[in-house]
Amino acid sequence: MDKLIIKGGSKISGSVNVHGSKNSALPIIVSSLLSEKTLKLSNVPNVVDVLNLIKLLKNYGVKIEHKKNKLKISPSKIKNLSADYDVVRKMRASILILGPLLSRFGEARISLPGGCAIGTRPIDIHLAGLSKLGANFDIQNGFVVGSVKSQLIGNKIKLPFPSVGATENILMASVLAKGETKISNAAREPEIEDLSKCLIKMGAKIEGHGTKTILVQGVTKLKKAEHEIISDRIVAG
């Protein structure tokens, strides 16, 4: 086809259903690890990455009820702090588990996504940001092993570039950190705003989400919440 001819002038009407955003659902599902209370989500997209993440959380001992586009996540009885390599290698978003686990339990162990070495993917920006909050990391046999001496402590963190994943990881970790955390050069995507809104419903104190500077005042615990995932802007076009 050499050309495409479009004849306008006709009135456009109707509607289309757009499923929930995968890039919003993944960090929000992970955020459930911060609390012992139930998190109910709706408009959850039925895509492979979400299904893999559900499998990963179940490996941790999280109870999850999945019906159509709804999730009921009950993370009160987490029994395992080491992520399964077979699941992690399938999805980069698994690195987001570090922040919540370190914040709530003070330790986490996760294989490098895809078995990659540091530097081949932007994992280092996650580790650098979490280190500013007081986390310590070692790389052992292809695993990232993180620990916290007592509790994560709020700090001023300036990202070298507005990484969406790093912003999400640091944001989640800082929710239970002691004191205030300031994230500068933060990502401003709608998915960051959606995650922040869900965390606020859970009891987090967050300001500035959707801007390049996010302020988080740490809290001691979170509460049960319900949240609807935003529609996928990529699918909507």
Predicted regions and their residues:
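Structural preference for solvent-exposed beta-strand-turn elements
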Residues: M1-G237
